[in-house]
Amino acid sequence: MGDIYNAIAPSLTLGCGSYGGNSVSGNVQAVNLINIKRIARRNNNMQWFKIPAKTYFEPNAIKYLRDMYGIEKAVIVCDKVMEQLGIVDKIIDQLRARSNRVTFRIIDYVEPEPSVETVERGAAMMREEFEPDTIIAVGGGSPMDASKIMWLLYEHPEISFSDVREKFFDIRKRAFKIPPLGKKAKLVCIPTSSGTGSEVTPFAVITDHKTGYKYPITDYALTPSVAIVDPVLARTQPRKLASDAGFDALTHAFEAYVSVYANDFTDGMALHAAKLVWDNLAESVNGEPGEEKTRAQEKMHNAATMAGMAFGSAFLGMCHGMAHTIGALCHVAHGRTNSTLLPYVIRYNGSVPEEPTSWPKYNKYIAPERYQEIAKNLGVNPGKTPEEGVENLAKAVEDYRDNKLGMNKSFKECGVDEDYYWSIIDQIGMRAYEDQCAPANPRIPQIEDMKDIAIAAYYGVSQEEGHKLRIERQGEAATEEASERA
């Protein structure tokens, strides 16, 4: 197998190469007709670690906008809440404190799940009315994601959204390659919630509300030019948003650490980000106003960005693939969806499958060991075996979610209608399987398994119970169909 698993390109044949010992192109020559068994030596492909050129952090880091080179015409991308909270005014104050005069426009109509129409509308304004040299995205993941695609469509109007949403397995070898950005404008991302990590990643999630699809768009050209991680701006997060965003960051760290793209450069970021979230999320949400809570909020803000740096190069997995799908179809907050699914995915990936995914640099399935390492890093009992460590970690995540944060245990508790949920189970399985995050999962996610997990997560029961419920439902449907035919 070639691509990320081996530097040898596949021959796509089972001819004499297979007879010689394997099916790669380096084993299909005349010499291989002799009955000598040869096996290609495994060579790992080059990997990468890519982040914005500049990342500024610590309280009041937005002051960098006063000195940043080349800001004369700026567009501020946000939502209405950022204006109401006065955060946009703080950005404007920094621009007005510059030595040169800055003209600016505000795009304040980004919705919680930014749509294709919204990004196209914003890009059209930039092209036709203003032509900014700087795009400043301020807010949660939605304004930052929207600004990335606006940036792309502003600089390259010839590109259509249908092109950039094309799937790929290896980001370096995709059918459609996004051209470089930054010739017309720089993108500055300023997060005000501590979760998405979008300020340092090459990802943007855009929703097609006509079809209900959430598209995770991925290309390193979309990596912001500058990230400003100012914890002061995150102090206004409502309690529920802080919980959801924090669990999103925790899921980023977990999935980056067990991803098939995980590497020495991302592992440190992922583990430390997970530890920071574990130690500080509850205090940042529940703590009384004061020095301890302020410190916890600062650590959470840093953790979210560090987790973003990890998954920006290691990618995510099936938890996010399912969360994108269920969130779009059921209108459940992304972080809340992740918090509901994460324990199920830990147990699913933590059990050794009959046919495990091949891992780069590894010759056996090691997800259980990786979860055990996460547990040990968090101070959770790692158990005597990897299997014990997996179960202890899943239970600890459930306990943290349920008891320390008081979050919903199931999608039913989130208010999702039961009949509607059953009507979309097939869509959930198929769309999650097709999601761009799924290929990096350590265990190849099967559609039927994801249906079972989705059903289990609706009722808050085990995956095994979810499987039984699905089989019973299928039997009832078959009986009803037979009766109608009779």
Q: What is each model feature region?
A:
Residues E117-V232:
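Glycine/threonine-rich beta-strand-loop-alpha-helix active-site module
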